[in-house]
């Protein structure tokens, strides 16, 4: 903000504070009345009366009480906005004079209540005749001049309340988000899943490979960690006999900011006993088609230059096959087998040839995943399940019966990004013990995102976890797809931001 703009804004704020002082003196009150009650919403009025003629409305003489924020003044008309939409209010000359005398006029951003008969203008727009009115809240700060297009991205995220006032697209995105979460919840309950809540603070971080946030519990005098995933607690519940559970809640990962990443984000995780990862893929297809149709009215929708189709069966291919498909001219990749993947020198050579910056502590499985991420992932625009993840990057997933180098795991991609991760759960306590120990060794070798050893979880597995499949779905990324937005900040109400200078 330039110095001149700041001075102009300060002047407007001072003027509006003066108006509020005038209102308090004139009304002998605090200037914020709380006794007006509306009985109608703009959206409902438009739906019910929008098709009626001017003459029909005059004959009806339907009196309504509305309330909302003044977004524009056009001659005698005020454009009032509230949660359901917009509607006009008409101030006759005597009313305009009263408004000036009582309130020193109304400003853009003020919140008012209006009561009067519903009419239609010569242009066919509904309006409420201002027979009774009250200024409910004086806006002391001016809105951006062009209320139809706040374009300062920093302001949009730092002052989301302003963004929601002035940007229809932002309001729509968060309405869709709310409906998506509700639709997923209803779908899961209809499928016999029980919604649960598990701890947000963990003594041992687990359930995913990520760097945690650390906090301290003063009374217990112990360090605790904001959860990176609820997985291990949810599987404890399956051990306890709750055979179908799900949770929609926040996870926290102490990582960087990007168009796809926010340190706190929303996941839906669910676990079902007596199922495998194939059942998860089938359920995911049904869920996403149902959610898209119920929220947006169609299972096909635009995303950038593409049309994403959530209907029908989704593509399924192994990670190795996907790498080959999107590197048709790379002879070493085309000749690659799982035996070759176990050759670290070969994998390092291939990774470098496709411009992957290799870390010294990466395993062969990590190298395969990085090659996939660099060359194949961005090209997966349509819903696709990528399967056969190496065991060394899947410490909680069940090994494949035919090839113990890989697991019965998939990740789900749409629009060139991962949206979900699922697998048949590892329920062999001894194998899990060994994999936890391998993760500890990896952490000691420099991998900050490797998992900790969780002895109590091993104890739970020793009591017996039935054959189980589990999955996590990133709500934020799913909403990005359903709203055709390309940065996660546009679908999180208050995203994490770097401190202002």
Swiss-Prot record:
Which coarse location class describes where this protein primarily resides? Answer: cytoplasm
The answer to whether the entry has keyword Disulfide bond is no
Catalytic EC class = ligase
Keyword Kinase recorded: no
Pfam families referenced in this protein's UniProt entry, alphabetically: tRNA-synt_2 (PF00152), tRNA_anti-codon (PF01336)
Question: What does the UniProt keyword field contain?
Answer: Aminoacyl-tRNA synthetase, ATP-binding, Cytoplasm, Ligase, Magnesium, Metal-binding, Nucleotide-binding, Protein biosynthesis
Name-wise, this protein is Lysine--tRNA ligase
The record's annotation in SUPFAM superfamilies points to: Class II aaRS and biotin synthetases, Nucleic acid-binding proteins
Per UniProt, subunit arrangement is: Homodimer.
How is its cofactor bound, per UniProt?
Binds 3 Mg(2+) ions per subunit.
Q: Where does Mg(2+) 2 bind?
A: 418
Q: Which GO terms describe its cellular component?
A: cytosol
Mind giving the lineage of the organism this protein is from?
Bacteria, Pseudomonadati, Pseudomonadota, Gammaproteobacteria, Vibrionales
Q: Where in the cell is it found?
A: Cytoplasm
Q: Which cofactor does it need?
A: Mg(2+)
Which GO molecular-function terms appear in the entry?
ATP binding; lysine-tRNA ligase activity; magnesium ion binding; tRNA binding
The EC number(s) attached to this protein equal 6.1.1.6
Q: Which organism is it from?
A: Aliivibrio fischeri (strain MJ11)
Entry coiled-coil feature ranges: none
**InterPro entries in the cross-refs:** Aa-tRNA-synt_II, aa-tRNA-synth_II, aa-tRNA-synth_II/BPL/LPL, Lys-tRNA-ligase_II, Lys-tRNA-ligase_II_N, Lys-tRNA-synth_II_C, NA-bd_OB-fold, NA-bd_OB_tRNA
A Gene Ontology biological process in which this protein takes part is: lysyl-tRNA aminoacylation
Annotated binding of Mg(2+) 1, by residue: 411, 418
Catalysed reaction(s)?
A: tRNA(Lys) + L-lysine + ATP = L-lysyl-tRNA(Lys) + AMP + diphosphate
Q: Which family does it belong to?
A: Belongs to the class-II aminoacyl-tRNA synthetase family.
């Amino acid at each position: 903000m330039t110095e001149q703009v700041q001075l102009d804004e300060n002047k407007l704020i001072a003027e509006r504070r003066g108006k509020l002082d005038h209102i308090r003196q004139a009304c002998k009150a605090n200037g914020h009345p709380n006794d007006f009650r509306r009985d109608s919403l703009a959206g409902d009025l438009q739906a019910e009366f929008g098709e009626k003629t001017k003459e029909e409305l005059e004959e009806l003489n339907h009196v309504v009480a509305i309330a909302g924020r003044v977004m524009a003044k056009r001659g005698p008309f005020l454009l009032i906005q509230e949660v359901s939409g917009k509607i006009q209010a008409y101030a006759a000359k005597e009313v305009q004079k009263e408004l000036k005398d009582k309130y020193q006029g109304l400003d853009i951003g003020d919140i008012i209540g209006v009561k009067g008969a519903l009419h239609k203008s010569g242009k066919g727009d509904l309006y409420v005749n201002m027979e009774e009115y009250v200024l409910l809240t004086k806006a002391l700060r001016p809105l951006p001049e062009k209320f139809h297009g706040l374009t300062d991205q920093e302001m949009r995220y730092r002052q989301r309340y302003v963004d929601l006032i002035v940007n229809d697209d932002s309001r729509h995105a968060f309405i869709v988000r709310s409906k998506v979460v509700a639709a997923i919840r209803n779908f899961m309950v209809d499928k016999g899943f029980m919604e649960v809540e598990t701890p947000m603070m963990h003594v041992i971080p687990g359930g995913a490979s990520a760097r945690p946030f650390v906090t301290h519990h003063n009374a217990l005098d112990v360090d605790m960690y904001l959860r990176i995933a609820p997985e291990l607690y949810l599987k404890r519940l399956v051990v306890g006999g709750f055979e179908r559970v799900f949770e929609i809640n926040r996870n926290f990962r102490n990582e960087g900011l990007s168009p796809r990443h926010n340190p706190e984000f929303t996941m839906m995780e669910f676990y079902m006993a007596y199922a495998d990862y194939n059942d998860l893929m089938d359920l995911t297809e049904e869920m996403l088609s149902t959610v898209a149709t119920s929220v947006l009215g169609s299972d096909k929708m635009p995303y950038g230059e593409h049309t994403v189709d959530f209907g029908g069966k989704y593509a399924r291919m192994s990670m190795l096959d996907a790498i080959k498909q999107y590197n048709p001219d790379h002879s070493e990749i085309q000749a690659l087998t799982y035996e070759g993947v176990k050759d670290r020198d070969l994998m390092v050579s291939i990774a470098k040839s496709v411009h992957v910056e290799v870390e010294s502590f990466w395993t062969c499985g990590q190298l395969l995943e990085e090659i996939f991420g660099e060359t194949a992932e961005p090209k997966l625009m349509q819903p696709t399940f990528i399967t056969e993840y190496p065991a060394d990057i899947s410490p909680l997933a069940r090994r494949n019966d035919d090839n113990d180098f890989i697991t019965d795991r998939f990740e789900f991609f749409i629009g060139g990004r991962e949206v979900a991760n699922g697998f048949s759960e590892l329920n062999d306590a001894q194998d899990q013990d060994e994999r936890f120990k391998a993760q500890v060794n990896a952490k000691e070798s420099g991998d900050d995102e490797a998992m900790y050893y969780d002895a109590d979880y091993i104890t739970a597995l020793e009591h017996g976890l039935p054959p189980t499949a589990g999955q996590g779905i990133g709500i934020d990324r799913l909403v990005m797809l359903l709203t055709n937005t390309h940065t996660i900040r546009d679908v999180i109400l208050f995203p994490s931001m770097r401190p202002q200078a």
